[in-house]
Regions:
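Flexible, low-complexity linker/hinge segments
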Residues: 100-124, 141, 149-151
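AMP-binding/adenylate-forming
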Residues: 91-101, 141-157, 162-226, 267
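Conserved pre-ATP/AMP-binding loop-to-beta segment of ANL
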Residues: 3, 9-15, 111-129, 160-167
Length: 311
């Protein structure tokens, strides 16, 4: 079951439901709903419309994102949290959300969901940067309707099992893939997620084995194509139920290494900021083909060497 982000804060979830955690702290729904409500109330008193938002902690990022949406702001996500990048992007916005405004509440009691109104899926908007792989990076606006539709499309395929108990990631939520899979999908599904990023495969697999029995890993070829040869993935097979990869081509060797040692092949997602998700595959062998995601139609123009996408 998936809850649209448009109605997420209206959901009557158990205050003790685990939202996110790291090695030293856990955040539950009662605290999360209070944090979002308090920040949204602060932001509603501010006149600025376009807000820059970047934060490396996925819990704080989610609080800021939901609070900005529920205060009627347009969110601009820069491609990273580096100071130079933030300074450049801040000049295109009315204000920057300061992490010091995010003071986690002490109350464990969830805010009455009736305090939140459903978000307008046509006007609520998040702006993201493209990768710049085909030229200079540009801003692409995604309505909440676009985002909820894409989450529902991925949910139809059922890749993340219902019994998943913790989601880990090696990718940033500042980009569309990480935004959807690292932050919004677990919130919509009610799956707890690890709040910090892992820079090294050894660290993420160690935490998976220590903290989870049925984990999901959101990753990319930048990490999966470079797994250390000495890393025994079979040691983690009973703790890791699924691996996702996006952001570039995953090598056949990496796919086979993961599949042979974990007992399941990584799920590759093809897409871009502009198009959203297009297709998926699992490289079980050299004949594995891409399959269109639910609701996506594709057509190839061989003469122009173009792929036309409609969703």
């Amino acid at each position: 079951m998936i809850t649209p982000i448009a109605t997420l804060m209206c959901a009557n979830r158990d205050p003790d439901h685990l939202v996110a955690r790291d090695a030293s702290r856990q955040w539950r729904w009662g605290v999360f709903s209070n944090d979002v409500a308090q920040l949204a109330a602060t932001l509603q008193r501010r006149p600025e419309r376009r807000w820059l938002w970047a934060n490396d902690c996925s819990y704080q990022f989610a609080v800021g994102l939901l609070a900005l949406l529920h205060s009627g702001k347009t969110i601009v996500l820069p491609p990273n949290t580096q100071s130079g990048t933030l300074a450049t992007w801040a000049s295109q916005c009315d204000a920057t959300l300061d992490a010091t405004l995010l003071t986690s509440g002490n109350s464990g009691h969830a805010v009455d969901p009736r305090c939140f109104a459903s978000l307008d899926t046509h006007t609520a908007c998040i702006e993201l940067a493209t990768s710049g792989s085909t030229g200079a990076a540009k801003i692409v606006a995604k309505t909440l309707g676009n985002i909820d539709s894409e989450l529902a499309s991925h949910q139809q395929l059922g890749f993340i099992p219902a019994h998943c108990d913790l989601l880990f990631s090696t990718v940033s939520h500042q980009h569309i893939y990480g935004l959807l899979f690292r932050t919004l999908m677990p919130l919509a599904r009610g799956i707890p997620y690890w709040s910090s990023s892992h820079a090294y495969p050894e660290h993420v697999f160690a935490d998976i084995a220590h903290y989870s029995q049925h984990a999901a890993l959101i990753s990319s070829p930048a990490h999966l194509n470079r797994l250390p040869p000495a890393l025994d993935l079979g040691h983690y097979a009973t703790h890791l139920d699924c691996v996702f990869s996006s952001g570039g081509p995953l090598s056949a060797d990496a796919a086979q290494q993961l599949g042979n040692q974990l007992g399941h092949y990584p799920i590759e997602i093809l897409g871009s900021t502009e198009t959203g998700g297009i297709a998926w595959r699992q490289q079980r062998d050299s004949h594995s083909r891409w399959r269109a995601l639910p609701g996506v139609e594709t057509r190839s123009d061989n003469d122009q060497q173009l792929l036309e996408v409609r969703s």
